[in-house]
UniProtKB/Swiss-Prot annotation:
It comes from Borreliella afzelii (strain PKo) (Borrelia afzelii). The keyword Transmembrane helix does not apply. Monomer. It is found in: Cell inner membrane. GO terms for cellular component: plasma membrane. This is Basic membrane protein B. Residues 1-14 form the signal peptide. The keyword Cell inner membrane applies. The gene is bmpB. Its main location: membrane. May be part of an ABC-type nucleoside uptake system involved in the purine salvage pathway. PROSITE patterns: PROKAR_LIPOPROTEIN.
């Protein structure tokens, strides 16, 4: 697994904010550090698309630089971020929860540089540095809709979930999905497992085939690149075996087997926050965690218009009439208090 770094130098005509870009400077370099492979057909691909949009909308003096390191190794993250600092980056995006710890340390050590991080996981007592913005997604809201659809569509009344590495983010997919399914059909049977990898396609394929062989006819996965294995399993089996994807619309990989994808539009969030900063004299409103969900249009289903019957559910979630669980504790409360199971 590798880390790709993109550097974009963007020519601006105004002076820059207090966070380290010298007044009178004419351009800023925007960098992105991605945990994992860039073209994962999912989470990281969405972030990369945002950079391509920035490149298109701010085309002057753009340069692209690649680097790589071993995923999950803290010292490698630090080394790559030091290189970005030496290259003159004024804004650095970190994509992936594995980069949460290093995001805090580098932002504290380099107050002159602005940072953003996608999907950070911090303790409740952590104070976010003023030059750091964290973006988290209420992905459980989209997964709830997917689970509801899966339960309605399943012929066998057996559905599955395959996650990558167990953690807060993957669990949000899982428990949102399970809650939505139970909301649609209290008697639905749900099997949830983890591949313990975001990149091992073969393991995910084996797990999917095992589930399908036991009568499960729909599998939702949230496993990064490994999810391709689930898609391949359904495609090879043919009619009657379905998948629900994650992060991006992946239906082109198996059009006849896809029901929908739970969209976490990392790209839209990254683009929105960055472009607003660029348009506002490079002011970076850090020191906070920004939550985005159905209400913001960055979480949902890839083909929501095909499922008119979920519109009322969307409204109830947005209006907080339905509080979707994102973890096991919340799910158990949901089952007992809402569904009376």
């Amino acid at each position: 697994m590798r880390i790709a770094i993109f550097i974009f130098g963007i020519l601006l005509t105004s002076c820059f904010s207090k966070n380290g870009i010298e007044s009178g400077s004419s351009k800023i370099k925007i960098s992105m550090l991605v945990d994992g492979v860039l073209d994962d057909k999912s989470f990281n691909s969405s972030a990369n698309e945002a950079l391509l949009r920035l490149k298109k909308d701010f085309p002057e003096n753009i340069e692209k630089v690649f680097s790589s390191a071993v995923s999950g190794v803290y010292s490698s993250y630090v080394s790559d971020l030091d290189n970005l600092k030496m290259n003159g980056s004024g804004l650095i995006w970190l994509v992936g929860y594995m980069l949460a710890d290093v995001s805090l340390s580098v932002s504290l050590e380099n107050p002159e540089i602005n940072y953003g991080i996608i999907d950070p996981i911090y303790g409740d007592d952590v104070q976010i540095p003023k030059n750091l913005i964290g973006v988290v997604f209420r992905i459980e809201q989209g997964a709830f809709l997917a689970g509801y659809i899966a339960a309605k569509k399943s012929v066998s009344s057996k559905i599955g979930f395959i996650g990558g590495v167990k953690g807060d983010i993957v669990d949000a997919f899982r428990y949102g999905y399970e809650a939505g399914a139970k909301y649609a059909n209290k008697g639905i049977e749900i099997v949830s497992e983890y591949s313990n990898s975001f990149s091992d396609i073969d393991i995910a394929r084996v797990m999917a085939n095992k589930m399908y062989s036991k009568g499960i006819d729909i599998i939702h996965f949230a496993a990064g690149l490994a999810g391709v294995g689930v898609i391949e399993a359904a495609k090879e089996l043919g009619d009657g075996y379905y998948v629900i994807g994650a992060d991006q619309d992946q239906s082109h990989l198996a059009p006849k087997n896809f029901i929908t994808s739970v969209i976490k539009n990392v790209g839209d969030a990254l683009y929105l926050i960055t472009s607003e900063s660029l348009k506002n004299d490079n002011v970076w409103e850090g020191g906070k965690i920004v939550q985005m969900g159905l209400r913001d249009g960055v979480v949902g289903l890839s083909n929501a218009n095909e499922f008119e019957y979920i519109k009322d559910l969307e409204r109830k979630i947005i209006n907080k009439e339905i509080i979707v669980p994102c973890n096991q504790e919340g799910y158990e409360i949901f089952i007992k208090q809402i569904l009376k199971l």
